[in-house]
C-alpha cells in the first residue's frame, strides 16, 4: 500500500537554494520536489499538509553525539536522547564509542547495534574507537558497517587515549575508514592542571578550565593529526575545533580530505560565560575566548569549517558539581542545535543555505551516508518543518533528554520546530513525539 503525502507551500531550503514549493513523499522516500505556490503532483496525494509560513529543511545529521548507551544509562539512553533529537529536527545521529563497554570490539559494536535497533527513534550510525591494542579489529571491520574510527589523541570522558606514536601512524596509514580525532595534548593539559592546582587548590574554579585545556594543547594535537593525514593521505575529520589558531591548519583547496567540525558550545559560549553558567558549559575541548568563538563563526560561514555538530554529552547535574578538576565535562545540546543555529542565521553570522550545507549536506558527504542529507527524489524522506518569528523560551519542561537540564535554559528562540519526518513518518508534531515505539533505521554508507 503506497501512501502519498504532499507537504505544500513551504519555503524549501536545499543545495544552495531557497524557494517556495512542495514536497511529495511516498511511504519512506521523496518522490518529487515541486516548485511554486500550490504546486501539485500529477498523481493526487492521499494527504496534504499546508506548510505555509514554514521552512522545509533536510533533516539534520548530527555526526557527534554521546547517547550513553550501553553502560551509562543513569544519565541518558538511546530512547531518551533520540527523542530529544527528533524534537530538535535531527533525523540521523552518529554515536561515539566511549560507553561501557567501549565500542572497540566486534562484540561491543554488535551490542550497541542491537540496542539502537530496538530503542532509537531516529536513524543511527556508529563510530568505533581506536585503542593502543585493537588494530586487528579495525583492520577487518566491514567498511559499510560504521561511519568512521574515533581516535582520542587527547584524554577525555571514557579514557580512550591513543598515545603511542607508532599506533597513530598505523591508524592513519590504514585508510580503510575516515578518522575522526579528538585533539588535545594530554601532557600539556596535565602540566597545566598541576600548575593551576598548586596555586588554586585541588579543584580550581571552572573559569580556569580554558587555561588548563588550553589553546596551545589543542593546536599541538591538531597539528600532529593534520600532519599525519597529509603524510598518509588519510581521510581526516577533526572534531570540535575550539580555537582561532587551529584554523591555520586547514586548506580545503590543497587538502580536501582533511576537514573540520565545530560544535555548538564553541559557537554559542565564551569564557566570559563561566561566571554565569559554571560547570554547565564545562566541556572538552574547553570553551575559550570571544576572539576564538568569532573566528570559528567566520570560518563556518566562509567554508573553512565543513560541519556543525553538537557533541551532545549529557550528565546528571549532580555530576556537574565542582570545579575544573572535579566536575565532569559535557553538556546536552542535540534538541536545541537547529534552533540555536537558526538564531545565528538571524544574527547574520551565516546564511540559511550555508547552515543547511553544514548540518545536512556536508555530514552526508564526509561520512558517505547513503540517500540522506538532501531533498532529492529517491532519497529517504527525512525533513523538518520550522517556523520563524515564533518566539519561545526554553524551560525544563520542554527538555526531552533524561538529564533534564540544558545550558540554554532561559534563552528565547525565534524559530520553532513544528514537525519532524523520519523516513516519511511524522515522528514529532508540535511539541509531541507521535510514537514512543517508532524505530529509526541503521545508516548505510556508500563505500
Q: Where does each model-flagged region fall?
A:
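N-terminal metal-binding scaffold of metallo-dependent hydrolase/deaminase domains
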Residues: 1-42
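Active-site metal-binding motif and surrounding structural segment of the metallo-beta-lactamase
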Residues: 39-56
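Metal-associated gating/positioning segment near the N- to mid-region
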Residues: 52-119
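Divalent metal-coordination and catalytic microenvironments
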Residues: 10, 23, 28, 53, ...
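Histidine-centered catalytic micro-motifs
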Residues: 59-70, 180-184, 241, 310
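C-terminal cap of metal-dependent C-N hydrolases
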Residues: 323, 377-444
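His/Asp/Glu-enriched, well-ordered alpha-helical/loop segment
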Residues: 203-224, 228-233, 301-308, 313-389
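Histidine/acidic residue-rich metal-binding segments in metalloenzymes
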Residues: 136-308
